[in-house]
């Protein structure tokens, strides 16, 4: 019979196994005292594998042979659905990263995030209904295993009746044995030549996504999303190219960065004519506050400069919380948003946040930090011909819907913070 504890009652002690009278030599059955894993804690075996491979760069798989690197939303939703979005004057889509709940004590958080996103799809007005989910990486943990996709991706999102695009995170690309091939399972689920039933989905019906590769462009009405792969390094900045570093050149080619520069050159005149907003998505955060500069950020800055176009918004995951920064670039405010709060676990060593304020007083000395929330949730991103908006919704009622939001004017680049609890645009 369950025993109810009052607020002042001591916490129950971990269960202790009853010792058997005797055991044959070499046999052990029960833990003397069971100590459950903390959120984010790895088993001993996982720690050994993690430490061995978490900093070993992997080659970036080339795009699928003959594939067009620019993916059209019409090829996925169909012309009629995209025409309806265009005629409505607005597109809405979901985005968040780091969803894969790999242990039982984390499943509920991912399920709650996925459930709230699925409920958004019940909206029938084309201008308000999310058209797709753009995943910011770390679909599964810890080592990109194919057998993790059912429990960490397909089942949690089984009620999400819309396309899901994704860029890989470091855990999607990590391996735990030299015989493994990096990103093999990710490509089998997101980069197939055509949509087919996903083997890893088991009896569930979702088909694979036919992205051209692990980096690509997605073109949709009012918005173009450039997605990059930032490799497997966990503790430290991501890497999209060799960065002219001799020790990287034998492993990581410059193909992705060269493609990015050419893609920015292609989009620059289109953006200048105000025909599309440009969003860049990369798993590792390239900017984490005033006075900081990492090599990934420097590499991207170089590409933006050479390509002649700076994105209107930069999205990333990796850090398991929600943060919004504004960086001064060429006289404008450029928003960098970290949203790695999709369900895996909240960063155990990050400072606590306060639902009553956007930025805790202890962090207010960084003028670039505009919002800091250590809570699970997801983003709704909206684009029109003249504006781009980001809305962060938390599954925690103390933060709630539209816990943070901004509207970007695509002509003046002005960034306006929205009112709490009210979705802009």
Language-model region placement:
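Acidic, histidine-bearing metal-coordination/catalytic regions of metal-dependent phosphoesterases
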Residues: 1-131, 150, 154-166, 179-184, ...
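The substrate-binding groove and active-site-proximal loops of carbohydrate-active enzymes
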Residues: 99-102, 137-146, 231, 243-253, ...
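Catalytic lumenal/periplasmic loop and adjoining terminal transmembrane helix
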Residues: 287-295, 330
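Extracytoplasmic/periplasmic, Sec-exported soluble proteins
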Residues: 105-109, 125, 248-255, 292, ...
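Extended active-site neighborhood of metal-dependent phosphoesterases/phosphodiesterases
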Residues: 34-39, 47, 52-81, 147-272, ...
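Short, solvent-exposed loop/turn segments at secondary-structure junctions
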Residues: 99-101, 140, 171-173, 231-234, ...
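Short acidic, glycine-rich surface-loop motifs adjacent to enzyme active sites
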Residues: 267-289
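Active-site neighborhood of phospho(di)ester-bond hydrolases with catalytic His/Asp-centered motifs
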Residues: 95-97, 131-138, 142, 164-170, ...
């Amino acid at each position: 019979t369950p025993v109810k504890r009052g607020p002042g009652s001591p916490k129950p002690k971990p269960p202790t196994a009853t010792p058997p009278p005797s055991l044959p030599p070499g046999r052990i059955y029960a833990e003397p005292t069971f100590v459950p894993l903390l959120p984010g804690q790895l088993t001993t075996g996982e720690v050994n594998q993690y430490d061995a491979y978490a900093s070993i760069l992997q080659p970036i798989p080339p795009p699928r042979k003959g594939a067009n690197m620019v993916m059209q939303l019409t090829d996925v939703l169909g012309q009629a659905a995209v025409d309806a979005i265009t005629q409505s004057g607005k597109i809405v889509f979901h985005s968040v990263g780091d969803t894969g709940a790999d242990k039982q004590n984390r499943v509920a958080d991912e399920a709650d995030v996925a459930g709230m996103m699925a409920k958004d799809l019940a909206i029938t007005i084309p201008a308000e209904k999310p058209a797709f989910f753009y995943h910011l990486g770390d679909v599964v943990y810890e080592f990109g295993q194919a057998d993790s996709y059912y429990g960490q991706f397909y089942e949690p999102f089984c009620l999400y009746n819309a396309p899901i695009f994704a860029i890989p995170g470091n855990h999607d690309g990590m391996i735990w044995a030299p015989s493994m091939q990096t990103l093999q399972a990710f490509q089998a689920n997101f980069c197939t030549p055509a949509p087919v039933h996903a083997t890893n989905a088991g009896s569930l019906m979702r088909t694979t996504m036919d992205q051209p590769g692990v980096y690509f462009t997605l073109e949709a009405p009012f918005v173009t999303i450039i997605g990059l792969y930032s490799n497997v390094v966990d503790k430290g900045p991501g890497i999209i190219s060799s960065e002219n570093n001799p020790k990287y050149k034998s492993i990581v080619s410059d193909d992705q960065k060269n493609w990015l520069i050419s893609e920015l050159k292609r989009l620059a005149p289109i953006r200048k004519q105000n025909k599309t907003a440009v969003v860049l998505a990369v798993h590792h955060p390239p900017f984490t506050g005033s006075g900081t500069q990492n090599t990934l950020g420097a590499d991207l800055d170089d590409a933006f400069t050479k390509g002649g176009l700076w994105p209107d918004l930069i999205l990333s995951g990796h850090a398991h919380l929600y943060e919004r920064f504004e960086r001064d670039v060429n006289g404008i405010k450029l928003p960098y948003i970290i949203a790695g709060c999709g369900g895996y676990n909240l960063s155990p060593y990050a400072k606590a946040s306060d639902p009553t304020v956007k930025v805790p007083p202890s962090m207010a000395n960084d003028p670039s930090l505009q919002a800091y929330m250590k809570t699970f949730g997801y983003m709704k991103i909206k684009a029109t011909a003249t504006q781009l908006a980001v809305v962060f919704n938390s599954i925690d009622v103390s933060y709630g819907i539209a816990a943070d939001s901004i509207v970007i004017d695509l002509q003046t680049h002005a960034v306006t913070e929205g009112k709490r609890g009210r979705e802009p645009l």
